[in-house]
Amino acid sequence: MKTIYFLISLILIQSIKTLPVLEIASNSQPQDVDSVCSGTLQKTEDVHLMGFTLSGQKVADSPLEASKRWAFRTGVPPKNVEYTEGEEAKTCYNISVTDPSGKSLLLDPPSNIRDYPKCKTVHHIQGQNPHAQGIALHLWGAFFLYDRVASTTMYRGKVFTEGNIAAMIVNKTVHRMIFSRQGQGYRHMNLTSTNKYWTSSNETQRNDTGCFGILQEYNSTNNQTCPPSLKPPSLPTVTPSIHSTNTQINTAKSGTMNPSSDDEDLMISGSGSGEQGPHTTLNVVTEQKQSSTILSTPSLHPSTSQHEQNSTNPSRHAVTEHNGTDPTTQPATLLNNTNTTPTYNTLKYNLSTPSPPTRNITNNDTQRELAESEQTNAQLNTTLDPTENPTTGQDTNSTTNIIMTTSDITSKHPTNSSPDSSPTTRPPIYFRKKRSIFWKEGDIFPFLDGLINTEIDFDPIPNTETIFDESPSFNTSTNEEQHTPPNISLTFSYFPDKNGDTAYSGENENDCDAELRIWSVQEDDLAAGLSWIPFFGPGIEGLYTAGLIKNQNNLVCRLRRLANQTAKSLELLLRVTTEERTFSLINRHAIDFLLTRWGGTCKVLGPDCCIGIEDLSKNISEQIDKIRKDEQKEETGWGLGGKWWTSDWGVLTNLGILLLLSIAVLIALSCICRIFTKYIG
């Protein structure tokens, strides 16, 4: 009997060890996946493909911008996928992250992992992260690209860049919804000491010192701040049109949208939820028992120095933010005894004429509540193009608590924030026109059970318009538009040229004459016979000619109307196929996630898992443009062409020659008659 129990116990233990969940939980070594899905590395500048955002391909020229997309997470095994060698990367990284004892927190690279071969600039970063656990991965699902190997993890001492491979496209919004489930244990990079940083480009190096990680661990209880750098490092950066800092959210639901930002900051969802939603133009500070929003403020004047704009307010569990051109921070103290009164009024603001700041009202209780819930405040630095005309959003359903430092106080005190600093209030700002509605706010995908009710946002292409707007309030004013909830939006990359209308455009049914005159055979024969009659012939031919010209114009008009209807139909078909292609890739990503514990889709299906949805939208849009261009061509005149004698002057010349010949013949006949008369007489 004991032997039987012993054998049963061994069988149970063996079966438990073979469970996929336990294998993943205990696996901390790189796991090679069958590279049946290999593709070509996409261009790093190609952020958008047919309306949905690809994660990780946004080029970040500073380690600050890139570190916001990296995090630590336990329970997920790394996997590597091969890809075809791509082009030169603009920005690469070489990271070394250790704990306080000096132990490396990154995995040792396998033998087949080599440095990314072609890098324009390599950012070398060395620092500590006392809270990191597990493996370093990309929050938005992008890959760390090495030499012809794309890995889901960051390896120690290896130069990598960020990007996607063709068969592994990940949608940022769905990725955020999937990993925003309660209990997911993200461990964010939070550096608590001054870290070594330098760059290498063209065999030259610049040694500087500064902070590079600013993301806060969501459940930390320590006061973490980043000391200022004595020497501000100069980083090669590309100045964006809009730069904003991030804040921390402690609610279970987050998801305000910023349609104008491609390189989004990350906001931390509440206790127990480790996923971070994309950064927005809103600076949000929320309490656990009260939903409140910090509204965005315009940035300092462009002439203000970067040193003055980087003043932040570290508090308990503070989150510091850097400007894209200066990774150093200036510590300051939290505004004491300051809190604004709740505001329920709908306000109107114009960015060109900002309203005067509002004085805060002393409230010790509110300050203690903020300290207990570990709230932080940050300043939003936004540089707007003077040609832009953004609309202002309004929030009338939530209490607004504002803790901000005005630009005047900041410019005077770049390192210390005065307790008397007056915050400014601004409504949320949106930089996009209205977009198509596919799902309303609060809806979730049917295959995602147990997710929090998170807002869905597809980041549209900047500086483009959305065609085929299906919003119910298409003709409403700007103020009415601001009250509509955020919706899923797809901005397509095809925009056919729309030229002006012509005389016979065929855009509407009434443009063309409904009657089309078809001459009968008898009428044609009659016209041919009457043409020889001296008086009736020319008149009949003139009537027939006028009728033919009218019929020709109607035919041209109808052809144009047919071309316009065909172009519109092709646009609708292109839109449908684009949406189907987009959501097919989204569904594929969800399936990959659900099958992760069994090795992924490729492990289950084998080579059949590869999908290649060819994108022919550009070719279709070119054909649409060609149709519209051809149908709008107009030519005047008879269009006879030919030689010079068939032109207007040629006809007159021929008539003149005939007239001269006739006169010459008459003169010759006259002379001949006289000669015969003389001889006969």
Swiss-Prot record:
Residues of the region (Receptor-binding) are 38-188
* Assigned keywords, A-Z: Cleavage on pair of basic residues, Disulfide bond, Fusion of virus membrane with host endosomal membrane, Fusion of virus membrane with host membrane, Glycoprotein, Host cell membrane, Host membrane, Host-virus interaction, Lipoprotein, Membrane, Palmitate, Signal, Transmembrane, Transmembrane helix, Viral attachment to host cell, Viral envelope protein, Viral penetration into host cytoplasm, Virion, Virus entry into host cell
Alphabetized Pfam families for the sequence: Ebola-like_HR1-HR2 (PF22307), Filo_glycop (PF01611)
Where are stretches of biased composition, namely Low complexity?
Answer: 327-347, 395-428
Residues carrying sugar = 94, 171, 190, 202, 207, 219, 223, 310, 323, 336, 350, 360, 364, 381, 397, 475, 487, 564, 619
| Biological process according to GO | fusion of virus membrane with host endosome membrane; symbiont entry into host cell; virion attachment to host cell
Region annotation Disordered: residue ranges?
223-428
Key word Endoplasmic reticulum present: no
Q: Where are its TM segments located?
A: 649-669
- Annotated region (Mucin-like region), positions in chain: 277-455
PTM statement from Swiss-Prot or TrEMBL: N-glycosylated. O-glycosylated in the mucin-like region.
All disulfide bonds of the chain are none
Signal peptide location: 1-18
Q: What does the record's miscellaneous section state?
A: Filoviruses entry requires functional lipid rafts at the host cell surface. Essential for infectivity, as it is the sole viral protein expressed at the virion surface.
Q: Domain description from the entry?
A: The coiled coil regions play a role in oligomerization and fusion activity. The transmembrane domain is essential and sufficient for recruitment envelope glycoproteins into VP40-enriched multivesicular bodies.
Tell me the PANTHER family matching this sequence.
ERVV2 PROTEIN, VIRAL ENVELOPE PROTEIN
Protein name stated in the entry = Envelope glycoprotein
